[in-house]
């Protein structure tokens, strides 16, 4: 009875103490599950390519900040790759054909080999040399000695590009590469709408498959896959990204101003990195345009559907709570 009387008489103090304990416990839990990008190993700060004489060379990667005024490269294409010898050729053929015709030599492809075990790097070097006849000016490979995750591969690639614009594109070629023109047009409109003539307005344009929700490409997916997809989209909506219908499309374009404001601050190295990119853009008031693109299903996904879907849901909660609690800060580089 004394204990009950004490609780009643001191209910405000008890409630406050329990609330503080709950918040501290939540903070500790989120902190323990939060992400910190792995620092790159020395060999991951170099790129592998073919020189003018056809020899394989390894050279230091450029730094993103060192090429802010480099207009020689209009578009950099970052392709995260993990065991992609069976799929990447079609994607590269489509991309390189378009890039040569549209931009001449003002482009580069940066493949980030995320610790592949199927000789993806050597395969890409071979087709670069023998089929595409490209050298280090336009075709570079960053090779990870250990798998970091798709987000880690994309982040590392974007931190070392030279282009005015940077495109992240999946290696499977599911997206029609020429649709990059739609994304560039969208960003150009954002840039020209700015009244500040001294600086470029940060802008992001993302490919979207939302318009295909009732098409054969989506309907033919398994019921489990579609249920997980709708469940994930609902969770993303609940956790605050309500203006974007398709957060996971592997076809996203950024101008250099947006790249500098997003990628050095990106924590997540797993599948959910797309969502953190958009969260950072929204928090930093960077304009995002969602553009419908052509897309088709390609076999050979590296995603373990059930396990990775659960992990993505967990990581989504962690990301949102980490920003809310101040564990992640959008003004502190990782």
From Swiss-Prot:
Signal sequence, renumbered to the chain: none
Pathway involvement of the protein, from the record: Protein modification; protein glycosylation
Listed CDD domains: DPG_synthase
Keywords from the UniProt entry: Endoplasmic reticulum, Glycosyltransferase, Membrane, Signal-anchor, Transferase, Transmembrane, Transmembrane helix
InterPro entries (UniProt xref): DPG_synthase (IPR035518), Glyco_trans_2-like (IPR001173), Nucleotide-diphossugar_trans (IPR029044)
Reactions mediated catalytically: a di-trans,poly-cis-dolichyl phosphate + UDP-alpha-D-glucose = a di-trans,poly-cis-dolichyl beta-D-glucosyl phosphate + UDP
A family per Pfam: Glycos_transf_2
Molecular-function annotations in GO: dolichyl-phosphate beta-glucosyltransferase activity
Note: Present with 5800 molecules/cell in log phase SD medium.
The protein, known as: Dolichyl-phosphate beta-glucosyltransferase
Organism annotation: Saccharomyces cerevisiae (strain ATCC 204508 / S288c)
């Amino acid at each position: 009875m004394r204990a009950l009387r004490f609780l009643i008489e001191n209910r405000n103090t008890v409630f406050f103490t329990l609330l503080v304990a709950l918040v501290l416990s939540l903070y500790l839990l989120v902190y323990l599950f939060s992400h910190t990008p792995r620092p790159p190993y020395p060999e991951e700060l170099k790129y592998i390519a073919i020189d003018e004489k056809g020899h394989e060379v390894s050279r230091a990667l450029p730094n993103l900040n060192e090429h802010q005024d480099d207009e020689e490269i209009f578009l950099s294409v970052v392709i995260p790759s993990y065991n992609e010898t069976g799929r990447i050729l079609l994607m590269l053929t489509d991309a390189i054909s378009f890039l040569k015709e549209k931009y001449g030599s003002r482009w580069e492809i940066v493949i980030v080999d995320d610790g592949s075990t199927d000789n993806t790097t050597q395969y890409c070097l071979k087709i670069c040399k023998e089929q595409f006849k490209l050298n280090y000016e336009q075709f570079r490979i960053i090779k990870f000695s250990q798998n970091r995750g798709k987000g880690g591969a994309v982040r590392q690639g974007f931190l070392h590009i030279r282009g005015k614009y940077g495109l992240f594109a999946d290696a499977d070629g599911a997206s029609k590469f020429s649709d990059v023109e739609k994304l560039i047009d969208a960003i150009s409109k954002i840039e020209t709408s700015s009244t500040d003539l001294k600086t470029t307005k940060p802008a992001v344009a993302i490919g979207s498959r939302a318009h295909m929700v009732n098409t054969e490409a989506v309907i033919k997916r398994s019921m489990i896959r579609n249920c997980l997809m709708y469940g994930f989209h609902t969770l993303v909506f609940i956790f605050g990204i309500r203006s974007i219908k398709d957060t996971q499309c592997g076809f996203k374009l950024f101008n250099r101003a947006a790249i500098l404001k997003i990628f050095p601050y990106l924590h997540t190295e797993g599948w959910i990195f797309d969502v953190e990119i958009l969260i950072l853009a929204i928090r930093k008031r960077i304009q995002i345009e969602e553009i419908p693109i052509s897309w088709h299903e390609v076999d050979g996904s590296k995603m373990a559907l059930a396990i990775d879907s659960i992990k993505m849901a967990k990581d989504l909660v962690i990301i949102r709570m980490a920003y809310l609690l101040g564990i992640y800060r959008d003004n502190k580089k990782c």
